[in-house]
């Protein structure tokens, strides 16, 4: 209840300047989710991500509340996407390349969502520059990306392993347009960060390395 009150306070402060979405990460039981989704809808939250783990519970919840329900952890590839779509268990799919089983399977997940009238969101697992570039290329091919994307993984890193950083500006990521993925690795930086047995990380008392 405290968490939902906190979300409600944030939304009240933001007003119409920004939308609010909540990721529950499967932390609720179905009963808790029923109460929580109703309260979040009343607070003005526009989307709740994976409130429960079970697809059957998602199916029941999505029919009860006006707030959009997004499937995330339940999506592990085309087969799970088809099952969720078959039972109408979500309003939105969070498509993640690794979780889907690779870029081609992510495209299949998106195609299933489109066919079922389910919205798409381009998810992230906090990939570095290479994984983010692959995600950007894949998501740019989606016919619809109604719920946007947030490929911010590289922005959390303090070191680069490519010769040129990805182009972030004005809250947008430009899809790399060079050969292949559009990313060129800095071989010296890759060698520096390699953990191949030659250079080892040793933890010493006091936290010194």
Predicted segment positions?
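Conserved hydrophobic beta-strand within the GNAT/NAT acetyltransferase core sheet
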Residues: 20-24, 71, 122
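Hydrophobic/aromatic residues in well-formed alpha-helices
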Residues: 33, 81, 189-190
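Short, exposed beta-strand "edge-strand" segments with a Pro/Gly-rich flavor and a Y/T-containing core
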Residues: 26-28, 48, 66, 70-76, ...
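C-terminal extensions of enzymes
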Residues: 159-209
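Alpha-helix termini
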Residues: 36, 57, 130, 136, ...
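Metal-dependent enolase-superfamily TIM-barrel catalytic cores that perform enediolate-based chemistry
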Residues: 1-65
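Shared catalytic-loop signature of beta/alpha-barrel
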Residues: 44, 53-70, 76-172, 176
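Electropositive phosphate-/nucleotide-binding environments in soluble metabolic enzymes
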Residues: 4, 30, 55, 103, ...
